[in-house]
């Protein structure tokens, strides 16, 4: 009888563990990336998120390219990349933290992953990327977009934090993860060294995996 009870308890514990092992996947084949992006951010219930999402749509984030001629240099590339980063940030987070601990910090992972490149949509009614037209008058096939010469070259991670905090509050960990998501490849490398955090590393690793492996990018254009 005792063995039967012990087996029952183990079965119940296994069932409970399965329920908390992993959150719902960030994306499934065929899902609309706009819906994934909106739904994930709204589920955080962060105050001001509805206004931020309205702003994100108005500013052109959903249609913006992710780079000039590197990974996902196409219309909608920035949205696609952001959803990819969330997908792999969740996988990394669950693998390293475990399902139960990950669920406690999931909101921060979602916010940092989906907003880390928010600044790439531009600012002051100016897009960060514009069409790259050659001297011949034809658009470049190798590098379809270029940095907008009319927009000052504020690092996009800095701009991401600025735009997000117009509408929502970010935690210190979230700000640091967004600011340093490029890791030692970007302008913050001296300040970051030795001050990495769990969230910053998860977002950095997910960003690298998405951009370099899944999306086929390289470092030929640096972080942007």
Task: List PLM regions with ranges.
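Short acidic DE-rich linear segments
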Residues: 2-4, 223-224
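Acidic, proline-/serine-/threonine-rich low-complexity intrinsically disordered repeat tracts
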Residues: 3-29
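Short linear motifs in intrinsically disordered/low-complexity regions
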Residues: 6, 32-36, 208
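Residue-identity detector for threonine
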Residues: 8-11, 20-21, 44, 50, ...
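A short, highly charged, low-complexity intrinsically disordered segment
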Residues: 13-17, 218-224
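Acidic/His-rich, divalent-metal-binding segments that scaffold phosphate/diphosphate chemistry
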Residues: 22-139
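Divalent metal-dependent catalytic cores for phosphoryl transfer on phosphate-bearing substrates
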Residues: 68-74, 80, 102-222
